């Protein structure tokens, strides 16, 4: 089994408990991070009528937050799609949001027309994409000119110190144990800190975005550097 297939199968296995684990392990902060990202994009992008796709959508958390943010910011979502390669995750998403279109596909091969989207989001998923540069090129392809890409991700820390040490201790020692109890799959939650350590720094990822045809509009770090928000415009 190839690396990408193993990652997808891991998410299939933890899908039934994924939402519960996320809320507990992040102390609910992941919802706040997503809301801030969606509202920031809505404030930057002036169009009122929007076509949105959420990539690596998982169980659909961002779908709901996009809908709530559009209502709050007086925007109109013409179409919103959730795309994920995990059938387990999509099964949960479809139960939660029966009126939303969900598509089984990987980020590196999107079944979407070129220049068909205003906004594309991917939350805590880009580090799980093996062919990351290919995925970023796909994001550029399906976005309209001046369309917005928003990425939420756990990036490799660039600084040391007490807070960084606490973060590392939690990720490597506490999170896998709690996640394992909730999901009965400890190895899946041991993968999380390893995948963060194997990912890019903020500067490295911004360079990849530029190389894929994007211009950075905004960056923000949440919760002492635990989570990063990247907002970029397609050139």
From Swiss-Prot:
Q: Name one GO molecular function term.
A: 2-methoxy-6-polyprenyl-1,4-benzoquinol methyltransferase activity
Keywords assigned: Menaquinone biosynthesis, Methyltransferase, S-adenosyl-L-methionine, Transferase, Ubiquinone biosynthesis
Task: State the pathway, as annotated in the record.
Answer: Quinol/quinone metabolism; menaquinone biosynthesis; menaquinol from 1,4-dihydroxy-2-naphthoate: step 2/2; Cofactor biosynthesis; ubiquinone biosynthesis
Fetch the SUPFAM superfamilies from UniProt.
Answer: S-adenosyl-L-methionine-dependent methyltransferases (SSF53335)
Segments spanning the bilayer are none
User: Record's InterPro entries?
Assistant: SAM-dependent_MTases_sf, UbiE/COQ5_MeTrFase, UbiE/COQ5_MeTrFase_CS
Describe the reaction catalysed, as an equation: a 2-demethylmenaquinol + S-adenosyl-L-methionine = a menaquinol + S-adenosyl-L-homocysteine + H(+); a 2-methoxy-6-(all-trans-polyprenyl)benzene-1,4-diol + S-adenosyl-L-methionine = a 5-methoxy-2-methyl-3-(all-trans-polyprenyl)benzene-1,4-diol + S-adenosyl-L-homocysteine + H(+)
Annotated S-adenosyl-L-methionine binding lies at 59, 84, 123
Q: Key word Disulfide bond present in the record?
A: no
Cysteine-cysteine disulfides: none
Could you tell me the EC number(s) of this protein?
Answer: 2.1.1.163, 2.1.1.201
The protein's matches in PROSITE patterns, at most eight in alphabetical order, are given as: SAM_MT_UBIE (PS51608), UBIE_1 (PS01183), UBIE_2 (PS01184)
**One BP term from GO:** methylation
Q: Which Pfam families match?
A: Ubie_methyltran (PF01209)
The family line of this record is: Belongs to the class I-like SAM-binding methyltransferase superfamily. MenG/UbiE family.
Q: What does this protein do?
A: Methyltransferase required for the conversion of demethylmenaquinol (DMKH2) to menaquinol (MKH2) and the conversion of 2-polyprenyl-6-methoxy-1,4-benzoquinol (DDMQH2) to 2-polyprenyl-3-methyl-6-methoxy-1,4-benzoquinol (DMQH2).
> What is the name of the protein in this document?
Ubiquinone/menaquinone biosynthesis C-methyltransferase UbiE
Whichever gene encodes this chain, its name is ubiE
